């Protein structure tokens, strides 16, 4: 058992933890009944682990929204300390803990869930597969990394070559994401996740915005877009005046359901020259917050913890079970 201090923080949740000789969850905003349910759930998991004594977790909650994030945080601690591969999978309003295709435990919300909802086919819920409304393999890779941690298999439109391109004629991120998700869902009868993401640069009045992918023209490439952006900011010398935000809007659409919408932003600055070999799009010229590091210098797992898309997916996972239950 290590002395490592673990931390997870976003705008809705903030947890700090370490492995100790006992199980303890304390802090703000968590009902005592919820803490007891989580402890009971994870005590069952602990009984299956081959740990050296003492064993246990000590978690302080600074900010709390839902049990999904808290359970995921504790399981991540357990996985790192024990080299296990326990997955946390939200399903039909419940939270499943699984490893090696075996169900270890189930967290039920207050009031439980109906058996019809729980055992519904994947066409009526996320199931095991998510269809992402994009042919962009870079974007798909990010979603695959994010959803893979939650036990989902990701498909994209390259798996369905017969589907038409959906024109992004909207003037906002939400309009474009809705167009893609709702059109593809109508054509396939599947649950579809679409995103519209872009870079908003304050000195350019929010541009390139919804035109981020084609900022340099109809034959735009990542390199051309980055070059145009740096050219537009050539006379802006102070970093604080080169502030920018990556923005993501996610929309989940399914037949006969109201669509679900979440948004997130990742603040930073535009560099004066590209740097880094990872990521795609504007990552080489985007400085992450006050870190001085470019997004293209981050490994995938680091980026997913911080990025606009990672934040949006975590928001989506927080609200999806309630949306699914309401729409069923």
Curated annotation (Swiss-Prot):
One of its GO terms (molecular function) is ITP diphosphatase activity. Binds 1 Mg(2+) ion per subunit. Substrate binds at residues 134-139, 197, 280-283, 303, 308-309. It comes from the Bacteria. Mg(2+) binds at residue 196. Pfam families: Ham1p_like. InterPro entries: dITP/XTP_pyrophosphatase, ITPase-like_fam, RdgB/HAM1. GO terms for cellular component: cytosol. Keywords: Hydrolase, Magnesium, Metal-binding, Nucleotide metabolism, Nucleotide-binding. Residues 1-129 are annotated as: Unknown. Its cofactor is Mg(2+). It catalyses: XTP + H2O = XMP + diphosphate + H(+); dITP + H2O = dIMP + diphosphate + H(+); ITP + H2O = IMP + diphosphate + H(+). Residues 130-324 are annotated as: NTP pyrophosphatase. The keyword Cytoplasm does not apply. GO terms for biological process: nucleotide metabolic process; purine nucleoside triphosphate catabolic process. It is an enzyme of class 3 (hydrolase). Its EC number is 3.6.1.66. The active site is at residue 196. Pyrophosphatase that catalyzes the hydrolysis of nucleoside triphosphates to their monophosphate derivatives, with a high preference for the non-canonical purine nucleotides XTP (xanthosine triphosphate), dITP (deoxyinosine triphosphate) and ITP. Seems to function as a house-cleaning enzyme that removes non-canonical purine nucleotides from the nucleotide pool, thus preventing their incorporation into DNA/RNA and avoiding chromosomal lesions. HAMAP family: Non_canon_purine_NTPase. Belongs to the HAM1 NTPase family. Homodimer. This is dITP/XTP pyrophosphatase.
